[in-house]
Regions:
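ABC nucleotide-binding domain signature
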Residues: 370, 415-425
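The feature captures the beta-strand-to-loop junction immediately N-terminal to the Walker
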Residues: 47, 369-374
Length: 426
């Protein structure tokens, strides 16, 4: 479908929701689905593309919700004024938490996000500012040009316009230069850094972007429900949002929307059916979601969206116009035979093992030189030291008169030193 067709479809859905023939139950469910989809879109960037698992997105949603709740009820600010403040609060929290948490990776990062998610939940439950576990009631409704949007049917359009904005911004981000750096975080971090990508910055940007979308979702949630308390922003909610991304397809924008629809519907039905089947009250749907996540990871690790798209008719490829691109600018090349790279006393120790010992060599521009040695001689370690993947225990590296000793991979790549790998890395 073309962009105009999608726009017409979206406008039609918004108008359809205003008709009284559509039951209020389905409008409420669609509103929750839209808010959940915004959070899941952040997880597409953070987890599906960036490879960083987070169980704390509901907490950032809570920052946005509580910010607007406090400012509209206590300070009397307009909800529209609190919208950027809610997103800013989530960003500020993500900046502080990310500065500490993003030093970790893999399951350590996931465990860290669980820890501060639980901590923030209990903190919100004991502070007078947040109304303790009772929360903050009587949040004013959003109004547009003097027209109140207190009715969920009227607020439907605001939510799904925000979903559309989130989809477009996510797609544009992933297609940008920053997006390519974020893609390099998953499985190709070393190769990306060696090509000049600032991956530490990319990790933080992905974390902040996901938090910003969660803050937006929190603002929408607060003015939809007109009350907030810690429960919707705890660890179980974060698990559900992660399940939405995984179930639909964590690396796909459409997967976030599909996952939000499926999990929201399943959650509503399971909360009604399971107590009758089991004969007891409890959050049994959490157990079902846990089992469902394991099954999806085993049977469809890429999610359901890629499988669904294979069943749909493919669009005919558009003809791409031929464009003449101007040549890229090139840096000044050194004169053949001029000094280029000088290594003096380069040493790398791993505890008591010396992998590289007092290596000295000198290269001039235009030379082709090979480094030859048996397995374990330190060839790969030498290349790692020269390209900033590893740091030398002693010695200096000078390139075109500039000391690069201790510089990281992106900085060295920007100076003009590139490398290849023994295994293919894209």
């Amino acid at each position: 479908m073309s962009r105009l067709a999608w726009l017409a479809l979206g406008a039609g859905c918004v108008l359809l929701a205003q008709l009284p023939v559509v039951p209020a139950f389905w409008i409420s469910l669609a509103n929750i689905t839209g808010i959940s989809a915004i959070v899941a879109l952040g997880l597409v960037v953070l987890t599906g593309v960036g490879g960083m698992t987070s169980f704390g997105q509901a907490s950032f949603m809570g920052f946005g919700a509580y910010t607007t709740a406090i400012l509209t009820t206590s300070a009397g600010l307009s909800p529209w004024l609190t919208l950027p403040l809610s997103v800013a609060a989530a960003l500020a929290a993500a900046l502080v938490i990310g500065a500490v948490t993003l030093r970790l990776s893999g399951h350590y990062l996931a465990l860290a996000t669980i820890a501060w998610s639980v901590s923030l939940f209990y903190l919100a439950g004991v502070l007078d500012l947040t109304g303790r576990y009772d929360g903050i009631p009587a949040i004013p409704a959003v109004s547009l040009f003097g027209f109140s949007l207190a009715d969920p049917r009227r607020f439907f359009g605001v939510i799904w316009v925000c979903v559309g904005i989130a989809v477009l911004s996510t797609r544009n981000l992933l297609d940008s230069r920053v997006g390519r750096a974020i893609r390099a975080l998953r499985g190709g971090a070393m190769a990306g850094a060696s090509c000049g990508a600032a991956l530490i910055r990319a990790r933080m940007l992905a974390f902040l972007y996901a938090a910003a979308l969660a803050g937006l979702a929190g603002w929408l949630y607060a003015h939809l429900q007109r009350a907030v308390n810690p429960t919707p922003f705890g660890l179980p909610a974060s698990i559900q949002y992660l399940l939405m991304a995984v179930l639909g397809g964590a690396g796909q924008i459409g997967g976030a929307l599909l996952g939000a629809v499926l999990v929201t519907l399943a959650n509503d039905r399971l909360q009604s059916w399971l107590p009758h089947l089991i004969g007891a009250q409890g959050n049994f749907e959490t157990i079902v979601f846990g089992v469902l996540m394991v099954l999806v990871l085993q049977t469809a690790p890429d999610g359901l969206w890629p499988r669904l798209t294979r069943l749909l008719p493919r669009r005919r490829a558009r003809s791409t116009p031929t464009l003449e691109a101007s040549p890229l600018s090139r840096r000044d090349l050194p004169e053949p035979g001029s000094p280029l790279l000088r290594v003096a006393g380069l040493t790398r120790r791993f505890g008591g093992l010396v992998a590289v010992d007092s290596l000295d060599f000198y290269l001039t521009a235009g030379e082709i030189v090979g480094l030859i040695g048996p397995n374990g001689a330190g060839k790969s370690t030498t290349f790692n030291l020269l390209t900033g993947v590893d740091r030398a225990s002693a010695g200096t590296i000078t390139f075109r008169g500039e000391d690069l000793t201790g510089s990281d991979s992106p900085a060295i790549a920007r100076r003009g030193i590139a490398r290849s790998f023994q295994h293919v890395k894209l």
